[in-house]
């Protein structure tokens, strides 16, 4: 009996649905869809409009948003199985949850917090209205989940996963990206790319400014664009974003335009460490002296079958450089742009 209890996935906390409906009633948003199904959302305040945006987003792509949310908690293995072991461990290794919880209040301003909360509140409303599509334990969605989602995913846009995979031998190379790229179009490597650039009036024949928005993303999945138009008394933006992201990360307004692209700048440093024990390292050499690793624990569950999952407990090591990975080729510390950055 103890073994069965040990393997049974913990029951989700009881959800206060009335509270979710009460919170939703404080927002006022209108969603109008054009002939292509693109939502045009109108609200008095930025939070009102973002609430409508979050609801429309959930209507159109709930399953992907749900996958992003469980990834942003480091819990994909509990729902998807052992193929997500590496990514859940990396989530804990990078201490995403700790960074968001410790920096949310101080690193994000009140207006942005209101927008993030509105998006999370909209996700909760849609979910309680469509409970048959919601995995156990996903609700309620919090502001921390939303921020953790893009804090966790951002480094993979400049191919941190490719850098990490190089640490492993070709025979033992894990899939470390939090999500598999998905697309309806399989292009040869030679014609893949992503770019964005601006042309100033001084460099155009007709003295007009041009912004070329040409980021190449999959047709579906967590890296696919979602198009929307959001209007409040203070903003009027049309553009696109990713599942689980409460703002348009590329687009236009009556006064400006902005874009982004996926590329591979030099934003990752990997340090090969001299350690006291390659199999069970507890110290590393730095500036001619031995230093103890900062040690904590990664804990998550891996789906088995039905209501059962297996608990995983694995050590997490940090050096002065950053998080530490033990690979067949050695022990490495990683420092990269965006590590534990919030806001």
Residue spans for each PLM region:
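Mature extracytoplasmic enzyme cores
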Residues: 1-343
């Amino acid at each position: 009996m103890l073994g069965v209890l040990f393997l049974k996935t913990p029951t989700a906390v009881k959800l206060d649905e009335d509270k979710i409906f009460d919170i939703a009633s404080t927002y006022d948003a209108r969603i109008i869809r054009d002939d292509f199904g693109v939502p045009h959302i109108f609200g008095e305040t930025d939070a009102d409009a973002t609430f409508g945006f979050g609801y429309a987003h959930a209507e159109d792509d709930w399953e992907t948003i749900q996958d992003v949310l469980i990834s942003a908690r480091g819990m994909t293995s509990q729902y998807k199985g052992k193929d997500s072991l590496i990514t859940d461990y990396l989530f804990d290794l990078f201490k995403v949850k700790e960074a968001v919880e410790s920096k949310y209040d101080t690193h994000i301003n009140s207006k942005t917090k209101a927008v993030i909360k509105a998006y999370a509140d909209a996700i909760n409303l849609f979910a309680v209205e469509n409970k048959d599509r919601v995995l156990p334990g996903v609700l309620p969605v919090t502001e921390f989940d939303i921020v953790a989602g893009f804090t966790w995913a951002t480094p993979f846009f400049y191919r941190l996963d490719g850098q990490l995979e190089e640490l492993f031998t070709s025979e033992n190379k894990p899939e470390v990206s939090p999500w598999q790229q998905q697309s309806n179009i399989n292009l040869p490597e030679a014609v893949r790319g992503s770019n964005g650039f601006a042309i100033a009036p001084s460099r155009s024949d007709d003295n007009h400014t041009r912004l070329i928005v040409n980021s190449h993303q999959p047709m579906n999945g967590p890296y696919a664009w979602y198009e929307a138009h959001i209007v409040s008394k203070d903003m009027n933006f049309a553009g696109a974003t990713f599942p689980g992201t409460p703002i348009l990360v590329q687009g236009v307004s009556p006064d400006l335009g902005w874009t982004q692209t996926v590329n591979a700048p030099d934003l990752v440093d990997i340090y090969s460490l001299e350690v006291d024990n390659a199999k069970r390292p507890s110290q590393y050499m730095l500036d001619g002296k031995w230093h103890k690793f900062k040690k904590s624990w990664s804990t998550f569950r891996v789906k088995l079958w039905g209501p059962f999952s297996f608990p995983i407990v694995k050590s997490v090591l940090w050096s002065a450089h950053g998080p530490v990975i033990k690979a067949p080729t050695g022990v490495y510390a990683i420092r990269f742009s965006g590590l534990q950055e919030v806001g």
